[in-house]
Protein backbone atom coordinates (compact mmCIF):
# COMPACT_ATOMS: atom_id res chain seq x y z
CA UNK A 1 0.00 0.00 0.00
CA UNK A 2 2.88 2.26 0.37
CA UNK A 3 3.43 2.15 -3.40
CA UNK A 4 0.04 3.70 -4.10
CA UNK A 5 -0.70 7.40 -3.94
CA UNK A 6 -3.66 8.73 -2.14
CA UNK A 7 -6.52 9.50 -4.54
CA UNK A 8 -10.03 10.69 -4.10
CA UNK A 9 -12.61 7.99 -3.64
CA UNK A 10 -13.95 8.15 -7.21
CA UNK A 11 -10.54 7.41 -8.76
CA UNK A 12 -8.63 4.20 -8.61
CA UNK A 13 -5.05 4.07 -7.63
CA UNK A 14 -2.56 3.44 -10.39
CA UNK A 15 0.62 1.57 -9.66
CA UNK A 16 3.81 3.47 -10.40
CA UNK A 17 4.80 1.04 -13.10
CA UNK A 18 1.57 1.55 -15.02
CA UNK A 19 2.18 5.32 -15.25
CA UNK A 20 5.41 4.73 -17.04
CA UNK A 21 3.71 2.44 -19.54
CA UNK A 22 0.91 4.93 -20.32
CA UNK A 23 3.42 7.78 -20.68
CA UNK A 24 5.50 5.71 -23.05
CA UNK A 25 2.44 4.92 -25.17
CA UNK A 26 1.57 8.61 -25.43
CA UNK A 27 5.05 9.73 -26.36
CA UNK A 28 5.91 9.61 -30.03
CA UNK A 29 8.01 6.79 -31.24
CA UNK A 30 10.90 7.31 -33.56
CA UNK A 31 8.62 7.08 -36.70
CA UNK A 32 6.02 9.43 -35.27
CA UNK A 33 7.83 12.71 -36.14
CA UNK A 34 7.87 11.66 -39.81
CA UNK A 35 4.14 10.90 -39.68
CA UNK A 36 3.38 14.24 -38.03
CA UNK A 37 5.51 16.09 -40.58
CA UNK A 38 3.74 14.27 -43.40
CA UNK A 39 0.36 15.19 -41.90
CA UNK A 40 1.43 18.84 -41.61
CA UNK A 41 2.66 18.79 -45.21
CA UNK A 42 -0.63 17.22 -46.31
CA UNK A 43 -2.66 19.87 -44.46
CA UNK A 44 -0.43 22.61 -45.91
CA UNK A 45 -0.96 21.23 -49.42
CA UNK A 46 -4.73 21.09 -48.87
CA UNK A 47 -4.66 24.65 -47.53
CA UNK A 48 -2.69 25.84 -50.56
CA UNK A 49 -5.15 24.09 -52.91
CA UNK A 50 -8.12 25.64 -51.11
CA UNK A 51 -6.49 29.09 -51.16
CA UNK A 52 -5.89 28.73 -54.91
CA UNK A 53 -9.52 27.68 -55.40
CA UNK A 54 -10.72 30.62 -53.27
CA UNK A 55 -8.53 32.99 -55.28
CA UNK A 56 -9.96 31.56 -58.51
CA UNK A 57 -13.53 31.99 -57.24
CA UNK A 58 -12.78 35.55 -56.11
CA UNK A 59 -11.38 36.32 -59.55
CA UNK A 60 -14.52 34.89 -61.18
CA UNK A 61 -16.68 36.92 -58.79
CA UNK A 62 -14.82 40.14 -59.61
CA UNK A 63 -15.16 39.46 -63.33
CA UNK A 64 -18.90 38.88 -62.90
CA UNK A 65 -19.24 42.13 -60.95
CA UNK A 66 -17.32 44.00 -63.67
CA UNK A 67 -19.47 42.43 -66.39
CA UNK A 68 -22.63 43.43 -64.51
CA UNK A 69 -21.37 47.01 -64.25
CA UNK A 70 -20.55 47.03 -67.98
CA UNK A 71 -24.03 45.74 -68.84
CA UNK A 72 -25.65 48.38 -66.62
CA UNK A 73 -23.50 51.14 -68.14
CA UNK A 74 -24.27 50.00 -71.71
CA UNK A 75 -27.98 49.87 -70.92
CA UNK A 76 -27.87 53.42 -69.55
CA UNK A 77 -26.04 54.60 -72.67
CA UNK A 78 -28.62 52.87 -74.88
CA UNK A 79 -31.48 54.54 -73.02
CA UNK A 80 -29.76 57.92 -73.26
CA UNK A 81 -29.27 57.45 -77.02
CA UNK A 82 -32.89 56.35 -77.43
CA UNK A 83 -34.09 59.48 -75.64
CA UNK A 84 -31.73 61.70 -77.61
CA UNK A 85 -32.60 60.31 -81.02
CA UNK A 86 -36.23 59.18 -80.52
CA UNK A 87 -37.54 62.16 -82.43
CA UNK A 88 -35.09 61.65 -85.31
CA UNK A 89 -37.29 59.19 -87.22
CA UNK A 90 -40.38 61.36 -86.85
CA UNK A 91 -38.47 64.48 -87.87
CA UNK A 92 -37.21 62.64 -90.95
CA UNK A 93 -40.85 61.94 -91.89
CA UNK A 94 -41.69 65.65 -91.53
CA UNK A 95 -38.96 66.88 -93.88
CA UNK A 96 -41.02 66.27 -97.08
CA UNK A 97 -43.85 68.31 -95.55
CA UNK A 98 -41.48 71.22 -94.97
CA UNK A 99 -40.14 70.87 -98.52
CA UNK A 100 -43.69 71.07 -99.91
CA UNK A 101 -44.54 74.13 -97.81
CA UNK A 102 -41.37 75.91 -98.91
CA UNK A 103 -42.12 75.10 -102.56
CA UNK A 104 -45.63 76.53 -102.15
CA UNK A 105 -44.24 79.72 -100.62
CA UNK A 106 -41.70 80.07 -103.44
CA UNK A 107 -44.40 79.71 -106.13
CA UNK A 108 -45.35 83.19 -107.33
CA UNK A 109 -47.86 82.18 -110.00
CA UNK A 110 -50.90 83.15 -107.92
CA UNK A 111 -52.91 80.18 -109.23
CA UNK A 112 -55.36 79.37 -106.40
CA UNK A 113 -56.25 75.93 -107.81
CA UNK A 114 -52.58 74.98 -107.96
CA UNK A 115 -52.03 76.28 -104.43
CA UNK A 116 -55.01 74.28 -103.13
CA UNK A 117 -53.72 71.14 -104.81
CA UNK A 118 -50.31 71.70 -103.20
CA UNK A 119 -51.85 72.19 -99.75
CA UNK A 120 -53.89 68.98 -100.14
CA UNK A 121 -50.75 67.08 -101.15
CA UNK A 122 -48.90 68.53 -98.16
CA UNK A 123 -51.76 67.52 -95.84
CA UNK A 124 -51.54 63.94 -97.18
CA UNK A 125 -47.78 63.95 -96.58
CA UNK A 126 -48.34 65.13 -93.02
CA UNK A 127 -51.04 62.49 -92.45
CA UNK A 128 -48.61 59.81 -93.68
CA UNK A 129 -45.91 61.12 -91.34
CA UNK A 130 -48.40 61.01 -88.45
CA UNK A 131 -49.35 57.45 -89.35
CA UNK A 132 -45.71 56.34 -89.38
CA UNK A 133 -45.24 58.11 -86.02
CA UNK A 134 -48.33 56.33 -84.58
CA UNK A 135 -50.16 59.64 -84.13
CA UNK A 136 -53.92 59.15 -84.39
CA UNK A 137 -56.46 61.91 -84.91
CA UNK A 138 -59.41 62.07 -82.51
CA UNK A 139 -62.79 62.56 -84.20
CA UNK A 140 -65.25 62.18 -81.33
CA UNK A 141 -68.47 63.45 -82.97
CA UNK A 142 -71.36 61.43 -81.54
CA UNK A 143 -69.26 59.87 -78.76
CA UNK A 144 -69.88 60.29 -75.04
CA UNK A 145 -67.86 63.17 -73.60
CA UNK A 146 -64.60 61.90 -72.04
CA UNK A 147 -62.71 64.54 -70.03
CA UNK A 148 -59.47 62.62 -70.57
CA UNK A 149 -59.75 62.85 -74.36
CA UNK A 150 -61.98 65.89 -74.91
CA UNK A 151 -62.08 69.47 -73.71
CA UNK A 152 -65.60 70.91 -73.69
CA UNK A 153 -65.84 74.54 -74.75
CA UNK A 154 -69.61 74.85 -74.38
CA UNK A 155 -72.87 72.97 -74.05
CA UNK A 156 -75.36 73.46 -76.85
CA UNK A 157 -78.98 72.37 -77.28
CA UNK A 158 -79.02 69.37 -79.59
CA UNK A 159 -81.18 66.42 -80.59
CA UNK A 160 -78.45 64.06 -79.42
CA UNK A 161 -78.27 62.29 -76.10
CA UNK A 162 -77.06 64.63 -73.33
CA UNK A 163 -73.32 64.76 -72.71
CA UNK A 164 -72.34 63.60 -76.20
CA UNK A 165 -70.00 65.47 -78.54
CA UNK A 166 -71.88 67.60 -81.07
CA UNK A 167 -69.05 69.34 -82.95
CA UNK A 168 -65.26 69.33 -82.97
CA UNK A 169 -63.73 72.81 -82.97
CA UNK A 170 -60.11 71.62 -82.91
CA UNK A 171 -58.98 68.07 -83.54
CA UNK A 172 -57.24 66.12 -80.82
CA UNK A 173 -54.42 63.62 -81.23
CA UNK A 174 -53.11 60.55 -79.44
CA UNK A 175 -49.85 58.69 -79.68
CA UNK A 176 -49.84 55.05 -78.55
CA UNK A 177 -53.14 55.60 -76.67
CA UNK A 178 -51.71 58.61 -74.83
CA UNK A 179 -53.41 61.95 -75.45
CA UNK A 180 -51.10 64.50 -77.06
CA UNK A 181 -53.82 67.10 -77.25
CA UNK A 182 -57.49 66.73 -76.30
CA UNK A 183 -60.10 67.59 -78.91
CA UNK A 184 -61.89 70.92 -78.34
CA UNK A 185 -65.59 70.09 -78.56
CA UNK A 186 -69.11 71.30 -77.94
CA UNK A 187 -71.33 68.96 -75.95
CA UNK A 188 -75.08 68.34 -76.07
CA UNK A 189 -76.84 70.02 -73.15
CA UNK A 190 -79.29 68.10 -70.98
CA UNK A 191 -82.92 68.49 -72.13
UniProtKB/Swiss-Prot annotation:
Keywords: Chaperone, Cytoplasm, Stress response. Residues 19-35 have a biased composition (Low complexity). Residues 1-35 are annotated as: Disordered. Its main location: cytoplasm. Gene3D superfamilies: 3.90.20.20, Head domain of nucleotide exchange factor GrpE (2.30.22.10). GO terms for cellular component: cytosol. It holds the Pfam family GrpE. Residues 1-14 have a biased composition (Polar residues). It is found in: Cytoplasm. It comes from the Bacteria. GO terms for molecular function: adenyl-nucleotide exchange factor activity; protein homodimerization activity; protein-folding chaperone binding; unfolded protein binding. The keyword Magnesium does not apply. One of its GO terms (biological process) is protein folding. NCBIfam families: PRK14139.1, PRK14140.1, PRK14150.1. Belongs to the GrpE family. Participates actively in the response to hyperosmotic and heat shock by preventing the aggregation of stress-denatured proteins, in association with DnaK and GrpE. It is the nucleotide exchange factor for DnaK and may function as a thermosensor. Unfolded proteins bind initially to DnaJ; upon interaction with the DnaJ-bound protein, DnaK hydrolyzes its bound ATP, resulting in the formation of a stable complex. GrpE releases ADP from DnaK; ATP binding to DnaK triggers the release of the substrate protein, thus completing the reaction cycle. Homodimer. This is Protein GrpE. It comes from Cupriavidus taiwanensis (strain DSM 17343 / BCRC 17206 / CCUG 44338 / CIP 107171 / LMG 19424 / R1) (Ralstonia taiwanensis (strain LMG 19424)).
Amino acid sequence: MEDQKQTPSNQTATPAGDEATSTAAASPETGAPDTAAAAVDDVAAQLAALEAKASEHYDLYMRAVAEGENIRRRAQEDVAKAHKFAIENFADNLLPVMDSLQAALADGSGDIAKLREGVELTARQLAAAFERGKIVELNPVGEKFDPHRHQAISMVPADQEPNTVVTVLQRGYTIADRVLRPALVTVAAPK
